[in-house]
Regions:
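Hydrophobic alpha-helical segments
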Residues: 1-220
Length: 220
């Protein structure tokens, strides 16, 4: 069954509920803005309750985050203190992502979006914690990435051409990022460590779009 799903999940002979879960994953990943009330109702009719939707969505969020970083992190591996600092940067939200058992299922974030409480806690920490990049830049990165998916042309931060190109690809098709585009950022003064911080924030924010969309439909 797994081979059939990997070849083409839309025609694979899988249970109706599994098919619905796969359709949710695809929509969150490729067409998050199409995730509306009618789409969610179709999932319910196929046997997915809110718990199953939430669990599938959390898996999808982490998949989209990890794959973007894997596609983007194609420059030399850092060593020594640099690697230790990067590890800290990648992990600084990990305990917050897990949250506490007493946490509510969702929270309305400072940006007005509804999302899992632990995920929002990790995201807010990622934007504000001390790093080599300034928090205002990280907020601009997050706003720019969100705008790529939501097709918003209002209040988009003005970024350099090199950073704009990089973040557009990171948002929509990270596998297309070129070495030359990373080099252009280095030429602007970004170190590899700073690029890693920007990439983590951008990938996290892009992965949030589908998750936010689902939670808005479920709980707003």
């Amino acid at each position: 069954m797994l081979d059939a799903v990997l070849e083409d999940w839309t025609t694979a002979d899988v249970p109706k509920e599994t098919h619905a879960a796969l359709s949710l994953l695809e929509c969150m990943t490729l067409r998050p803005m199409e995730l509306d009330a009618s789409f969610v109702e179709g999932l319910r009719e196929s046997g997915l309750d809110e718990f199953k939707m939430r669990e599938a969505a959390k898996v999808c969020f982490q998949y989209n985050l990890i794959t973007r970083m894997a596609d983007a992190f194609d420059f030399p591996v850092l060593e020594g203190k640099q690697q230790a600092r990067l590890t800290k940067m990648l992990n600084f939200g990990s305990t917050r992502l897990r949250g506490k058992n007493a946490d509510p299922l969702w929270t309305r974030s400072a940006d007005g979006r509804i999302r899992p409480t632990g995920v929002d806690r990790g995201w807010q920490t990622m934007l504000s914690t001390k790093g080599l990049t300034d928090p205002p830049l990280r907020h601009d990165v997050a706003a720019f990435v969100t705008a790529q998916w939501r097709l918003s042309h209002k209040d988009i931060p003005q970024l350099s051409d090199a950073l704009t190109t990089y973040l557009k690809k990171l948002s929509l098709y990270a596998y297309r990022i070129l070495d030359e585009e990373v080099d252009a950022l280095r030429a602007e003064g970004y170190t590899d460590e700073m690029l890693c911080e920007i990439t983590v924030v951008g990938a996290f924010t892009a992965a949030l779009v589908g998750l936010d969309q689902l939670f808005d439909v479920l709980y707003d």
